[in-house]
């Protein structure tokens, strides 16, 4: 096969994936950016070019800034917790423990449940006076508390649900990485007299860095795309205390029908995710050993 034939064959193999990527990713992104510079047609008013007006509106929108702040706190609360719990569970079920298969199933089960089902399960836990959490705290002598109806606890309650949902998913990747490691490494460390903690810190965790980067990227994306739990459990309340960026975009676009402003919000969300991804690869990729 000639070089030109190889080149043509390679591009033909890539063409279906490139077409799907362009159709469902690149074109919507470019169309959203274009739409963010225009107004939303309403009634007899046609679409007009407004330039950066939609972006200027962001600076004067207090709900946007609150949603952005909520999302940043949500990310800071869920990403480290879900990753640490996933790593702990993976190390636990990778060892020789009784009922290892049952533990793996139990840890992974929340991942396969639909998001709406998970939200409804936790609604039962958080129900005032009758919920499981209320029954437990009441037995300990604590006063009744509306967990999802209080601004001080509503966002934290969503964080708990998210960590419970995602930790099992991330555990699978850590478990696969642990099982791909050579057992001779642990044997050599034991001969040298290294403790388990020293072996984990100096050998295991550095070898897990490629997996950690992959999990971190997914955790950041998940933290900024959550909308199901918010819709079912709080609808952004109380007083926008649990309104996250994607939920706010959903409200602007489909409740208030302001598609142009929603497009501008979407571009801000894409910019936040892009900057987060660049920062992760810039700081972590240089510390990763792939071989």
What spans do the regions from the language model cover?
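A structural signal for multi-pass alpha-helical bundles of membrane permease subunits
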Residues: 6-291
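Short, Lys/Arg-rich, polar N-terminal cytosolic tail immediately upstream
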Residues: 1-5
């Amino acid at each position: 096969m000639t070089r030109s034939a190889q080149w043509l064959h390679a591009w033909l193999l890539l063409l279906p994936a490139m077409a799907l990527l362009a159709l469902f990713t690149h074109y919507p992104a470019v169309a959203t950016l274009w739409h963010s510079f225009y107004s939303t047609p309403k009634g007899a008013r046609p679409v007009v070019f407004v330039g950066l007006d939609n972006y200027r509106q962001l600076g004067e929108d207090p709900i946007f800034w609150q949603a952005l702040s909520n999302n940043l706190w949500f990310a800071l609360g869920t990403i480290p917790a879900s990753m640490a719990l996933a790593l702990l569970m993976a190390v636990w079920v990778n060892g020789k423990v009784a009922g290892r298969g049952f533990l793996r199933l139990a840890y992974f089960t929340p991942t396969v449940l639909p998001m709406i089902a998970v939200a409804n399960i936790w609604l039962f836990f958080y129900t005032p006076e009758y919920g499981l959490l209320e029954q437990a705290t009441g037995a300990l002598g604590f006063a009744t508390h509306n967990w999802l109806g209080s601004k001080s606890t509503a966002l934290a309650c969503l964080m708990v649900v998210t960590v419970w949902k995602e930790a099992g998913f991330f555990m699978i990747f850590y478990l696969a990485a642990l099982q791909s490691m050579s057992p001779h490494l642990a044997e050599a460390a034991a001969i040298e007299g290294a403790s388990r903690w020293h072996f984990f810190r100096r050998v295991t965790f550095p070898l897990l860095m490629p997996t950690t980067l992959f999990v971190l990227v997914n955790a950041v994306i998940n933290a900024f795309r959550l909308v199901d739990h918010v819709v079912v459990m709080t609808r952004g309340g109380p007083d926008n205390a649990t309104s996250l960026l994607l939920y706010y975009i959903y409200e602007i676009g489909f409740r208030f029908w302001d598609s142009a402003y929603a497009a501008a919000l979407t571009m801000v969300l894409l910019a936040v995710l892009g900057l987060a991804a660049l920062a992760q690869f810039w700081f972590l990729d240089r510390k990763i050993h792939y071989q």
